[in-house]
Amino acid sequence: MIIDSHEHVILPAESQLEKLKRASVDKAILFYTTPHPEKAKSYGEWKEEMAKLFRILAGENTEKSNSERIHRGNQELLRSIRAFPEHFTGFGGVPLGLSLTETGSWIEEEILRNGLRGIGEYTPGSEEQIRQLETVFQAL
């Protein structure tokens, strides 16, 4: 069995599955994502999708908007996994900046209850975000 150990969700899931088949990959470990450059129909739309990533890395989002964004990303991830469980498994997102109790609850509700295999990925864009990883590690 050939497993791709790191892919981000591509929409629609059927498109991602087709890419796996063309590459003779049996299964992929998926990670949630916010930008979806594959949906862009023009260079301008592609730039808009990538701007989302740059705002995240710059820490320009509120704690509430980050939690909402990651929850939506986890839901997309779960839809892909549930549509093709023989081909996809996944790691879910956990927001930074929550308290230890909130982080533990998030992991229980969003990750464990949904059968996800782990958490990730993190791309901290500031020293503050790097320090906030400690809470996630403690909650595990």
Annotate each PLM feature.
Residues 1-72:
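An N-terminally biased module of ancient metal coordination in phosphate/nucleic-acid-related enzymes
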Residues 53-140:
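Active-site gating/metal-coordination segments in enzymes
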